From Swiss-Prot:
Reaction catalyzed: L-histidine = trans-urocanate + NH4(+)
UniProt cross-references to PANTHER family, sorted A to Z: HISTIDINE AMMONIA-LYASE (PTHR10362)
Family that this chain belongs to: Belongs to the PAL/histidase family.
The record's account of how the chain is modified after translation: Contains an active site 4-methylidene-imidazol-5-one (MIO), which is formed autocatalytically by cyclization and dehydration of residues Ala-Ser-Gly.
Annotated organism of origin: Dictyostelium discoideum
Compartments, as annotated in UniProt: Cytoplasm
Cross-link (5-imidazolinone (Ala-Gly)): 151-153
Recorded GO CC terms: cytoplasm
Pathway(s) of this molecule: Amino-acid degradation; L-histidine degradation into L-glutamate; N-formimidoyl-L-glutamate from L-histidine: step 1/3
Keywords: Cytoplasm, Histidine metabolism, Lyase
Protein's recorded name: hal-like protein DDB_G0273787/DDB_G0273081
Amino acid sequence: MIETNHKDNFLIDGENKNLEINDIISISKGEKNIIFTNELLEFLQKGRDQLENKLKENVAIYGINTGFGGNGDLIIPFDKLDYHQSNLLDFLTCGTGDFFNDQYVRGIQFIIIIALSRGWSGVRPMVIQTLAKHLNKGIIPQVPMHGSVGASGDLVPLSYIANVLCGKGMVKYNEKLMNASDALKITSIEPLVLKSKEGLALVNGTRVMSSVSCISINKFETIFKAAIGSIALAVEGLLASKDHYDMRIHNLKNHPGQILIAQILNKYFNTSDNNTKSSNITFNQSENVQKLDKSVQEVYSLRCAPQILGIISENISNAKIVIKREILSVNDNPLIDPYYGDVLSGGNFMGNHIARIMDGIKLDISLVANHLHSLVALMMHSEFSKGLPNSLSPNPGIYQGYKGMQISQTSLVVWLRQEAAPACIHSLTTEQFNQDIVSLGLHSANGAASMLIKLCDIVSMTLIIAFQAISLRMKSIENFKLPNKVQKLYSSIIKIIPILENDRRTDIDVREITNAILQDKLDFINLNL
């Protein structure tokens, strides 16, 4: 076992069958320490012994006693095998762009440990023990965002984490940037001296794209929950019919996501009395065409919310399954059979599952944005809002209301539409034609992560505008009451931002509500995806 502090421990046994997405999120936030079973450490040593025995037989093993990539037909002298691994890290250290935030990097460190703990990578136990010390002590390598093509895994960004294990590169420790060697001295951690295969095992995997995807899908679930809450507020603000959420309708469509969204909306509206049921509208027979006071159906953004957004809840659930599988996988090459010593050359480092699932999530992000944009448009025009003032102005003509916010939201929605294009179809040949097909998994994951920042602001704006719509109803309709769950949501918003009484800057309101969404400070109904 490794030393621990006051934080809870997460025990790694190699199988890691109890690992859940929430565990990864918790560890990525620095909330738990990593410890290992003694049985796992013994198993890893047996796997390492298998590799050492194989090397003594002068068997050519890719990346261990051969060159890398397109140079895989070149044999490396035995006395250069350890240097060969450190040299690998040197030539891969060529990333660019901003650094990943601390949460992503802690997630990467943990996922490397998970992958190597399976015992098929041929590394010594001290490799994952040292990495766990870095994670537990709070040593955060500075890892550039750009450089991976997601084939042979995330080679370039992972080289920065591997270098830090050896005391090279830059890290953040106690919120200060410093040389890795200095951080290791402060924390009394010995630099790792790589042996054969270990450099390759550290960089050859899908760990970066998996961390970004895991944290992003968790964030998307939080934002999607807020989006459904904003729809509930909008329905009340627009005095819309709830007949369309009758569970008899949705149970007949069979899709679990649609049923879930309808159930959530019904939980919000279970005590609502702010509309006349459209099914109760009557008329007197006449020979002439008559016009009803209101339509018997709402527009699609209101009526069809479960049908439109249900697939997104299913996609989030499926993405979590795929990401968890990837995190628990052995995604290295070559693999060393810890039981028989066989060397298996394959391509588990390919990130196509992550690429495809996160490209799909990018589409889902855009679809949520489109939906909320339509609801905001309804609330902002008196012709479609059942009498609310244009732009939800508290005094039309004198004040312009949320006109600027609607324009700003439209700008964000257009950005998301632009960014929703899939990355995985843009494969390009690289590295001496060895990597002639690449997954671009990190491109997909980074793209989704970037889009979520904009989506959260779009949801925030929708909440603010629906909040204003309800506030105006309260002033204009005597005894206007909200259903209990919607009232709780409304009350949690008014604790953070004021009702718009006159024209003022509203960017601060957006920032406050966005932070409240991400920090789970608003009273939304959980989706439990």
